[in-house]
Amino acid sequence: MPWDQLARQSILLQAVSVWRDDPENWLAGSFDRLPETVRVNPLRSDSEWTEGWLEGIGSERIGWFIGPGSAWTLPFNRGAAEGDIREMLADLHETGRLTRQEAVSMLPAIALDAQPGEVVLDMCASPGSKTTQISEHLGEAGAVFANEVVNSRVNMLVTNVQRHGSRTSVVVHHDGRYIPRVPESGFDRILVDVPCTGSGTTRKNPDVWGKWLPSGGRSLHDLQVALLSRAVALVKPGGRVVYATCSLDPVEDEAVVAEVLRNSEGVDMKSVMELLPDVPGEAGRTDWPSLDDGGGVTVVEIPESMQPPSEQGIASQLPRSMRVWNDKIGGGGFFLAVLEKSEDAPERPAPEVEVKMTAEEVKPDSDNSPRPIPDEVASVVESAWGALPDDLWLRGKRLLLSTPEVHDVWESERSRRGGRTRIPGGRWRPLKVIHLGLSAARLRRGDVERIVAGAAHELAPRLPNASSEVDGDLIDALLADEEMSPDEAGVNAVRGGHILIDRATRDCVSVWVGVRVSLMLGKAERRILSLKRGLSITEKEEE
């Protein structure tokens, strides 16, 4: 059946006919494929160049986007780029200079408004676009714990935070409903972008037309309530929780928020319309009917938590949430609610401590967990680089750059068994940490093998003995695959991993100095640098 016919016969359109007086307008704006939209990474020193490239191909800034960074609508549909533009877009994404992301999915991180130095939780994080956006808000200070419960999606999350190149990310693997309270003091801000039926995603996932049923939202409601409830429990007094779905169904949206407010003290909603004044949204609802799986209004009984709230104190707050309709924003449909915990919100009384474990009594973290760099490795690194960067971690054979706030969480005391057992810090347990920070270098046979290209711009100013300023012509020659000896490059006293800095443009490139000087750049980074510098693009790859 053609998609347009399927859409017109869909249960979803029947439901929207109940929720809106003008369902035909919604349908007209919910069918065409989405435009390609991207977010530019402001943590990269050449972000202005990336923005210039986007302008050059006819892209337009998204007017309602609030930085840091910028967001753009490209002049073609999602996935429809061709030729050199398609290749460069892939390169810019791969190297972390931009992130492909649906425009409406940028809204939650804007509403969260994380500040540098804060400790943030992204409770349902994969594939990671919102995590990387939070990292951009944090800059070089703070931590965002990116949690994912599904094994197969954890790898995708790690890949994306590594690609982005932020020092603040920490990837953890838990069921969000039971994620441990680490740090014990709680999080400054929490994003809860819950699993949902995706009724707002018809332009991205046309299969929704044939699959969506009202019973789907009811089946997810309890999970959504549990995830948001855990977030409210984990956020600090004075902290903020953002609840987000790509669903238009009030059972997954306002009903979830109302149930959490019903069971929480000292928590109130903040107006999303005021936080995002330029977004064409609609105030949340205080009333909605129950729907059967034909999309019609029904009198069948459903649990109280899925019904409109009878409490005036809760109902009066629901219009502070915001629903974004596909046709109003020219993209996907979305729902947002912002909850804030008051400074004097009652905290659950701490139970009496029954056991206080020593470091020796606690099961150690997995060998694969990141840990602060041990003394013996620190000596090797300092010998190789002439200095030891702060906040350096080790995971396997990989050196990672992080932040003081991540280390503070690792050092902090925590508890188990509801607080009855105290555990000393200096570990991640009971938190299961998979990856953190920016990959900086690799070890091989006990020595620092090389500096990872994506970390060169971070490490260069910290490592005067492991970096050299050179004329731009020299870097151009290396990009053009000209053979060069250490003497010709002016690094005759250097062996091993090194960073060359263009003294004019401040471009940083990772090299290996042996018998000759070799660029340690992947194809994507090599192509972008060549384009930036006006060179012909070569296909050689060293990394």
Identify the function of each model-found stretch.
Residues 139, 235-237:
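Helix-to-beta-strand junctions that scaffold the AdoMet/dcAdoMet cofactor pocket
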